[in-house]
C-alpha cells in the first residue's frame, strides 16, 4: 500500500516539512534538538587512560574499578573537556556497590555487551550498578518547583505562547545575553487546575492532589537571539502559555549556575542482576542512572535489573541500551524500565523485554523534548507520560506489538496522577492498543500508527463520560517521512547530522514495487582510520550504530595470523575501504563448528551483536533492502571446506 500523508506534518514538493497549526498557532514541535550536544552530533570516542582486568572469580571488584575511575577523574581535561576513559578488559566483575562517575569528562567503557565482553555482576546490598552524578543536590532543570526568593524574575508579556514556539516576549531584556541558560516558569493556578478538571480527584473517599497551586512548571532553555524585547530560544517550547490561566505571571529567570556533570559516558557493558521476582518496592538492583548534561550511554545490556534506566538533566543520548526482564514482576504498582526525566533526551535503538512493567514512564512536570527512536518493546507493558503534566514526548517508529501507548488522564491513580502528558506524538508506531486522550486546550497525536484505539473514562470515575479522544491521523497507514525526528534533524542540520548519529544519507533507491524506498543506514570507511589499530575501527563503527569485533578461534586462543580488519585506500575503487582478511592457516584448518583449533572463516553482517529477533525492526507493508559493495582481490584463494566471504544475518 502507498504511504499515507499526515495532515499535521508532511513534506511539500521541494521536500520541506510543512506543519499544520491550530487556530492559536500550536503545532507539533521540532523534536530534533533531542540528544547529545542538541542532536546530530556523533558520540565521542575518548581514549582509555587506564585498563582494568578482572580479579578472582568471586572477588569483589568495586573498589578496584572505582580507584581507576578516581585516578582518571584527577587528570586534567583536554580541549574538548575530556579527561579519559577507564577500559574494562573482557571478563566478569563482581560488584557489591555502585560504580560512580562524579567528575566531568570521564568515560567508563567495557569491551562488549555480550557474555564474552565486560560483565558487571551485581551482588550485595541494594544499589545501582553505575551512577553518573556529581553528588550536588540540584534542580533537574525540568520539574515542578518553587521559586527561590533571591532570584530575579523577568515578566513574560505574551498573552498566549503556542506550543512549538521558539519565541517569547519579556518586559525587560537588560542583563540578558545570547548564550544565557534560562528557565521559563509557568505558575500552576487554581483557575488552571479547575479548567483541566483536576480539582475533584477522589480515591477511597479521600481528596487527591494533582498539582498543588503555587507550584511552577519549569522549562530550561538557552537564549539563541534577542530581537528587541523578543527572546529567541535554542529549543522550542513544548507547552502552551496562556496568561488567562497563569494570572499573567509567567516569568523568565537566568540560571547560568546549574552545576551538572558534562561530557561523561558509559559504554560497551553488560550488567547482570540476580532474578528479582518481587514487587519493585523490594527491588535490590538497578542498572544505570545519569544526571548530567551532554552525556551518553551506549551498547549496554542489562539483565534482570529493575527500574533499570533513569536519566535526568538535558542533552543526553541513550543508544542501543537493552533491558531484559524474565523474572515476572509481582504486584499492581509497576516499575519503569526507562525513566527519562529532563529535556533534549534521545533514546535511540533501545529495547525492553518483560511483562507487568512500564516500558517507559515519565516523572512529573517534564518539559522535553524526549524522543524514543526506533525502539522495540516485547511483552505486555505500556509507555506513558504517567503523571502530573509532562509535555513533548515523541515515540518515533516504536514497536510494541503486545503492549500499549497511553497519552491519558490517570485520574486518582497513584496519589492523583491526573493528566500525564500533552503535546506528545506517536509517529509510525505499532502497538496492540492506544489510549490517546486530549487534555483541555491541548493536543496529543497518534499519526501513521497501527493498533486499536481504546477510549476510556477517567479512572475512579467510571460513572463519568468517556474522555475526549486525541488525534488519530492516517491511522493504520504509515506516513512519510518514515521518521519524524530524522526528517526534522535533516532539515535543521543537513544529511551530515543523520550520518553522525548512525543513520547515513537518505537517497532514493530504485525498486520495481516502491517509489518511496529510502536508504536510512549506511557506513563508509573514513580516511582518518588508515593505519590505525582495529580497536579504533571498532569504535568508529559503533559510533555510527554498527559494529566490528575480532573473535579468537574456537580454541579461545588469540589470532596468530594478525588482525583482520583495516582501512586503506583502494586504487581500483578510488576510495578508502574496509579490508577484511579471512583466516587461512595450516594450524587451524576449516572444519565443523566447535572442533578444537577449527577456524570458521567469515565476515558477518548482523542486525545486532546478539541474536534477539526484535532488534531488526520492520513495519507492516514496509520493504527492507540490505546491500553492501565488496571487491574480491585477484588470486583470492579460500580454503576448500568452509569460508564465508560475506554472511548476512
Regions found by a protein language model. Give the residues of each.
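Extracellular beta-strand/beta-solenoid scaffold signature
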Residues: 124-144, 148-149, 165, 244-256, ...
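Short glycine/acidic-rich loop motifs that flank beta-strands on beta-rich extracellular proteins
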Residues: 77-78, 97-98, 117-119, 232, ...
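Right-handed parallel beta-helix
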Residues: 105, 110, 180, 186-220, 224-230, 262-349, ...
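Low-complexity, Ser/Thr/Pro/Gly-rich disordered linker/stalk regions
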Residues: 512-649
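Extracellular "leader-to-stem" segments immediately downstream of a signal peptide or signal-anchor
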Residues: 1-276, 447-513
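Gly/Ser/Thr/Ala-enriched C-terminal appendages of enzymes
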Residues: 372-511
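Extracellular beta-strand solenoid repeats
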Residues: 87-89, 94, 100, 107-109, ...
Amino acid at each position: 500500500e502507498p504511504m499515507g500523508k499526515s495532515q499535521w506534518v508532511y513534506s511539500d514538493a521541494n521536500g520541506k516539512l510543512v506543519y499544520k497549526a491550530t487556530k492559536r498557532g500550536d503545532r507539533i514541535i521540532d523534536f530534533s534538538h533531542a540528544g547529545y550536544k542538541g542532536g546530530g552530533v556523533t558520540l565521542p570516542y575518548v581514549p582509555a587512560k587506564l585498563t582494568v582486568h578482572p580479579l578472582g572469580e568471586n572477588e569483589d571488584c568495586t573498589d578496584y574499578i572505582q580507584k581507576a575511575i578516581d585516578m582518571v577523574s584527577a587528570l586534567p581535561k583536554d580541549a574538548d573537556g575530556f579527561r579519559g576513559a577507564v577500559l574494562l578488559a573482557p571478563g566478569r566483575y563482581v560488584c557489591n556497590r555502585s560504580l560512580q562517575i562524579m567528575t566531568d569528562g570521564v568515560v567508563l567503557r567495557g569491551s562488549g555487551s555480550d557474555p564474552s565482553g565486560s560483565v558487571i555482576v551485581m551482588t550485595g546490598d541494594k544499589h545501582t550498578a553505575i551512577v553518573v552524578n556529581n553528588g550536588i543536590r540540584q534542580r533537574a532543570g525540568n520539574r515542578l518547583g518553587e521559586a527561590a526568593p533571591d532570584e530575579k524574575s523577568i515578566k513574560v508579556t505574551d498573552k498566549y505562547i503556542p506550543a512549538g514556539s521558539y519565541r517569547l516576549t519579556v518586559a525587560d531584556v537588560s542583563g540578558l545575553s545570547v548564550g544565557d541558560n534560562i528557565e521559563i516558569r509557568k505558575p500552576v493556578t487554581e483557575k488552571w487546575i479547575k479548567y483541566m478538571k483536576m480539582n475533584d480527584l477522589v480515591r477511597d473517599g479521600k481528596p487527591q492532589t494533582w498539582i498543588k497551586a503555587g507550584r511552577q512548571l519549569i522549562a530550561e532553555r538557552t537564549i539563541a537571539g534577542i530581537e528587541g524585547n523578543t527572546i529567541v530560544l535554542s529549543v522550542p517550547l513544548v507547552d502552551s502559555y496562556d496568561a488567562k490561566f497563569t494570572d499573567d505571571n509567567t516569568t523568565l529567570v537566568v540560571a547560568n549556575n546549574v552545576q551538572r556533570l558534562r561530557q561523561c559516558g558509559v559504554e560497551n557493558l553488560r550488567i547482570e542482576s540476580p532474578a528479582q521476582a518481587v514487587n519493585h518496592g523490594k527491588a535490590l538492583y538497578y542498572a544505570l542512572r545519569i544526571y548530567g548534561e551532554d552525556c551518553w550511554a551506549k551498547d549496554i545490556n542489562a539483565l534482570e535489573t529493575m527500574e533499570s534506566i533513569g536519566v535526568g538533566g538535558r542533552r543526553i543520548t541513550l543508544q542501543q541500551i537493552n533491558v531484559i526482564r524474565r523474572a515476572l514482576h509481582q504486584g499492581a504498582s509497576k516499575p519503569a524500565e526507562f525513566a527519562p526525566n529532563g529535556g533534549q533526551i534521545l533514546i535511540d535503538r533501545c529495547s525492553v523485554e518483560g511483562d507487568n512493567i512500564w516500558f517507559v514512564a515519565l516523572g512529573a512536570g517534564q518539559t522535553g523534548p524526549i524522543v524514543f527512536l526506533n525502539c522495540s518493546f516485547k511483552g505486555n507493558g505500556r509507555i506513558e507520560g504517567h503523571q502530573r503534566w509532562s509535555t513533548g514526548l515523541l515515540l518515533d517508529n516504536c514497536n510494541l506489538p503486545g503492549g500499549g501507548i497511553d497519552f491519558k488522564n490517570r485520574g486518582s491513580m497513584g496519589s492523583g496522577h491526573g493528566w500525564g502528558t500533552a503535546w506528545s506524538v506517536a509517529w509510525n508506531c505499532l502497538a496492540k492498543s492506544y489510549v490517546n486522550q486530549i487534555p483541555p486546550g491541548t493536543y496529543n497525536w497518534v499519526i501513521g500508527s497501527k493498533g486499536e484505539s481504546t477510549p476510556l473514562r477517567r479512572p475512579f470515575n467510571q460513572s463519568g463520560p468517556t474522555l475526549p479522544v486525541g488525534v488519530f491521523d492516517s491511522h493504520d497507514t504509515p506516513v512519510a517521512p518514515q521518521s519524524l525526528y530524522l526528517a526534522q534533524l535533516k532539515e535543521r542540520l543537513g544529511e551530515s547530522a543523520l550520518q553522525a548519529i548512525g543513520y547515513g544519507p537518505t537517497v532514493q533507491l530504485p525498486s520495481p514495487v516502491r517509489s518511496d524506498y529510502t536508504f536510512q543506514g549506511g557506513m563508509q570507511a573514513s580516511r582518518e582510520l588508515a593505519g590505525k589499530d582495529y580497536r579504533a575501527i571498532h569504535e568508529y563503527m559503533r559510533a555510527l550504530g554498527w559494529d566490528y569485533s575480532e573473535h579468537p578461534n574456537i580454541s579461545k586462543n588469540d589470532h596468530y595470523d594478525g588482525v583482520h580488519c583495516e582501512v586503506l585506500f583502494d586504487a581500483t575503487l578510488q576510495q578508502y575501504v574496509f579490508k577484511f582478511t579471512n583466516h587461512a592457516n595450516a594450524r587451524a584448518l576449516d572444519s565443523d563448528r566447535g572442533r578444537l583449533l577449527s577456524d570458521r572463516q567469515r565476515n558477518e553482517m548482523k542486525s545486532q551483536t546478539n541474536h534477539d529477533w526484535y532488534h531488526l525492526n520492520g513495519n507492516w507493508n514496509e520493504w527492507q533492502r540490505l546491500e553492501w559493495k565488496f571487491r574480491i582481490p585477484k588470486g583470492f584463494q579460500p580454503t576448500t571446506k568452509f569460508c564465508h566471504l560475506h554472511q548476512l544475518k
